[in-house]
Amino acid sequence: MKEKEIQENMNKSIEATQRNFNTIRTGRANASLLDRVSVDYYGAETPIKSLATISTIDSQTISIQPFDISCLQAIEKSISMSDLGITPNNDGKVIRINVPPLTEERRKEFCKLASKYAEEGKVALRNIRRDAVDKEKKDEKDGLISIDESRDNQSEIQKITDKYIALIETKLSEKEKEILKV
């Protein structure tokens, strides 16, 4: 694996981890909160953002305006059944969600969830590293590169991995601060 390819794969893992972090509720209303909620729309699981305009009215309220009014009940049901712990209010045209402030216990649960997502991201990075190191060892065994080149490349791969793991740790720290901020 080339260094550029390794970094591209690791960047994808970082982006996936960030998307997971974005779905964790903080004390503020955020449209990305609903990214993981999908609606059973004509027999197909469809993301809410494909069915409606989602906007934040203020720091505590999210507004969902469906493109097709007939899917209003389905959207409301999907939000109610999600693990977000929020209750939608349907006025017949728009769904409003009041995001209540988080309790201390709920904040700790979300911090644990953020840690879990960070760990999944680190595991993905380590898997990329393992694949790259295995390729280096195979190339060395096949005589395509020298032992010294292989060791240098493996050392470089480890440095890249350490850099990306530190980036995940930084993002986790930022997310935990955001969650714990009252």
Swiss-Prot record:
CDD domains: RRF (cd00520). GO terms for biological process: translational termination. Pfam families: RRF. The keyword Protein transport does not apply. Gene3D superfamilies: 3.30.1360.40, Ribosome-recycling factor (1.10.132.20). Its main location: cytoplasm. The keyword Mitochondrion does not apply. It comes from the Bacteria. One of its GO terms (cellular component) is cytoplasm. Keywords: Cytoplasm, Protein biosynthesis. It is found in: Cytoplasm. GO terms for molecular function: ribosomal large subunit binding. Responsible for the release of ribosomes from messenger RNA at the termination of protein biosynthesis. May increase the efficiency of translation by recycling ribosomes from one round of translation to another. HAMAP family: RRF. Belongs to the RRF family. This is Ribosome-recycling factor.
